Amino acid sequence: MQAIQYPLAVGTGTTRIIEAGTGPTVLFSHGLGARADRWRTTVERIADRGYRAIAWDLPGHGFSTREADGPSDVPALAAHALAVMDALGVAEGVAVGTSLGAHIVAYAACSAPQRLRALGLVGALGIVPIDQAVAERISRNVRVSTREQFDGKLRFVLHDPAAVTDALIEEEWRTNTAPGTIAGFARIGEYLTTRIANDYIAAQLKVLFPPDKLLLVWGAEDKAVPLPVAYACREALGEPALAVIPAANHCPYFENPAAFDAALLPFLTHAFAGAA
């Protein structure tokens, strides 16, 4: 099913929505320095299975508004996620977030547990403590500004070098060097290295969401958020299912979609069981 995209007013700015399908709503949140179209093919595949699938650009990312005082920490980004749901008329759904996007949807779920039935957490940051070196590396990677640096950044998060095409590098460079973008990323990067510890969310998640309402998905070759973090998340959250995706680095939904969907689709069926 082909997705559509359109602008959506949220707060004082706009975001971009990528959407396909009808049915129970599944929301997809990208991570720091990425954008909604990383999820486009996933949105289309999940829509084909009977869901309304939606991805959106985080503030300051993709085609969303750049604001000098835009959201730059997880509590504010989580509030924005709930505002996106409001603007779309989505009363409840399941959220799937990757990297910092996983922290964002987890924080949103703890803020408004009646809005999110279950969570898929992919290569998740911010659930359990991360090494300072990991935070600093991510912060550096989102401040890059040349095509050569974007080439290196993409090779760091994608397992197959052939996936790093000239077209992808060019798109990444043009989108992430638009006026105001790097400054916005830098503010979030500073949060990662100095303040994220205030917002780790595992303890709250464990209280509010039983293990069968949580799914962990990790690339077997994840270099950005290494696999030991997945095991720490599983222990902290009461042993939810963990799917380790082969031949995938930090973007398993993009790198090995068949294996990713094989983990996600049964989880969605269970999450929406009994929904009106």
Region roles according to the model:
Residues 130, 147-208:
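Conserved alpha/beta-hydrolase catalytic His-Asp/Glu region
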Residues 1-26, 48-51, 90-91, 268-276:
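Alpha/beta-hydrolase fold catalytic core
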Residues 221-225:
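Acidic catalytic loop of the alpha/beta-hydrolase fold
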Residues 239-276:
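Catalytic active-site module of serine/aspartate enzymes centered on a nucleophile-bearing elbow/loop
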Residues 210, 216-218:
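Short beta-strand/loop motif that positions the catalytic acidic residue
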Residues 106-110, 117-148:
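Flexible "cap/lid" loop of the alpha/beta hydrolase fold
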Residues 48, 55-100, 254, 262:
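Active-site loop/oxyanion-hole signature of alpha/beta-hydrolase fold enzymes
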Residues 16-63:
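Conserved HGGG/HGGXW glycine-rich cap/lid loop of the alpha/beta-hydrolase fold
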